From Swiss-Prot:
Belongs to the peptidase M20A family. N-acetylcitrulline deacetylase subfamily. Its EC number is 3.5.1.-. It comes from Xanthomonas campestris pv. campestris (strain ATCC 33913 / DSM 3586 / NCPPB 528 / LMG 568 / P 25). Co(2+) binds at H72, D103, E155. This is N-acetyl-L-citrulline deacetylase. It catalyses: N(2)-acetyl-L-citrulline + H2O = L-citrulline + acetate; N(2)-acetyl-L-ornithine + H2O = L-ornithine + acetate.
Length: 366
């Protein structure tokens, strides 16, 4: 085991021990994980800001770096299926297991290890609100307009540079009907649940019509009706129904246009339609601008000797940096298939590969 990997594992064990589950959005700026990170970054100018509701950012700079590394420190809640305490990291022959080791405290530990392996220029932005779908930390950073050639956002990409991914939009719909006995002939709009079912059929047909759309190796529109609530009992016409759905567009797709199309499948007089969250695609912008930004990110990956991976379906905050005008890519250790799972793990080989690469970027010739 190399010294870099040993140092990474030491820091990772400590980072895992801090409870940063989100929700409940209870991560504090003082004490805990942020005090630990501050203490591990001697020689850095460190700024910790509490943005409220568990959103805390730590911005650390040494020298005049060209690149910013961004890592979120919050994790999803643990499930009942963990076989041991999720906040006690376990080591096996080829991996470590613990809540957040893959998504994505392993990257944070590696960056701290690399920072302490030399005195090269470096900039880190650690945040605690990525899992909350309320990106206050990134929004506050973008408002400052600090100059960087590129931002490398850590998420599990098998230590390959990801240049493109889907956006995400979440929508709440409410349908209004008229209560009554189910034995009689119904007006088609009487049942709120029937309205929701008809809307779902039209929406699914539209999604199928987009199956052949492509961008950067991605195909089609990802769409999911995640929840439908409503009605009282089988012999009563449902007076109200609520439906929640989400979709993940290609970078080349017009999100506002898609929302208008989905909204148009319902009677506006009987349905409420509200987008509750939107994350842009990576790269952001129209087709021409997105392709220009993708090529710029590819040039950065090539300059840093990072292997380039395929575009991915999952969303990351790299898209927020892209929308804010930065060249951005996603790069981190581990497999996304392990994120959010019981007994989450990352392999030692992945941590080794990542820490060596960021050490080279920080302390090498880049």
């Amino acid at each position: 085991m190399t010294d870099l990997l040993a140092s990474t594992l030491e820091h990772l064990e400590t980072l895992v021990s801090f409870d940063t589950r989100n929700p409940p959005r209870a991560i504090a700026a003082e004490g805990g994980i942020f005090d630990y990170l501050r203490a591990q970054l001697p020689g850095f100018q460190v700024e910790v800001i509490d943005h409220g509701d568990g959103a805390v950012s730590l911005y650390a700079v040494r020298g005049t770096p060209k690149y910013l590394f961004n890592v979120h420190l919050d994790t999803v809640p643990d499930s009942p299926h963990w076989s041991a305490d999720p906040h006690v990291m376990r080591r096996t022959e080829d991996r470590v297991i613990g809540l957040g080791v893959c998504d994505i405290k392993g990257a944070a530990a590696a960056l701290v290890a690399a920072a302490n392996a030399g005195d090269g220029d470096a900039a880190f932005l650690f945040s605690s609100d990525e899992e909350a779908n309320d990106p206050r930390c990134i929004a506050a950073f973008l408002a400052r307009g600090l100059p960087y050639d590129a931002v490398l956002v850590a998420e599990p990409t098998m230590s390959e540079a990801v240049l493109a991914h889907r956006g995400i939009s979440s929508v709440l719909m409410r349908f209004a009907g008229r209560a009554g006995h189910a034995s009689g002939k119904q007006d088609p709009a009487a049942s709120a649940l029937h309205q929701a079912m008809r809307w779902g059929g039209k929406a699914l047909d539209h999604v199928e019509s987009l199956a052949h759309a492509r961008f950067g190796g991605l195909t089609g529109l990802r769409f999911n009706i995640g929840r439908v609530d409503g009605g009282i009992k089988a012999n009563m016409i449902a007076p109200a129904a609520e439906l929640r759905f989400g979709f993940r567009p290609l970078p080349s797709m017009d999100v506002d246009g898609l929302l208008a199309t989905f909204a148009g499948f319902a009677d506006p007089a009987a349905a409420h339609f509200e987008e509750t969250f939107r994350g842009p695609s990576l790269p952001s912008g129209d087709i021409a601008r997105a392709e220009e930004r993708r090529l710029a990110a590819r040039d950065v990956a090539d300059a840093l000797d990072l292997p380039i991976g395929n575009a991915v379906d999952f969303w990351t905050e790299a898209s927020l940096f892209s929308a804010g005008g930065y060249t951005a890519l996603v790069y981190g250790p581990g497999d996304i298939a392990q994120a959010h799972t019981a007994d989450e793990f990352v392999t030692l080989a992945q941590l080794q590969r990542y820490v060596e690469s960021v050490n080279r970027i920080i302390n090498g010739s880049h």
